[in-house]
Amino acid sequence: GAIWLTYYPHIMVEWYPHVLTVSTLYPMGVDKTMNMVEFYYPEEIAAFEREFVEAQQAAYMETAIEDDEIGERMDAGRRALLARGDNQVGPYQSPMEDGMQHFHEWYRARLGDAVPRG
């Protein structure tokens, strides 16, 4: 498991067992973004567990490729909306983020009156 923290709008910190990962998004243009990923390991792992480091980074990159596909598909959808003069600002982009919307609705319902509705 991991603990994720997003420092809106462009930095994500992911804390996994034995590694801290920082992803920073840099807009390069209206249709291009660079994702700089940095990995931080405890000294003993960085020095003596090279196979672990390589396996962990390979697993991370496999997930990053999936995330990249989602981003590219969402970008293509935004371009299609623009081309037909439509504007859907979100915050969720269906169908790719429907799960996130359902999760937030479920979570808000569990919080009840502790969180103001807006």
Label each region the model flagged.
Residues 1-118:
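C-terminal catalytic domain of Rieske-type non-heme iron oxygenases
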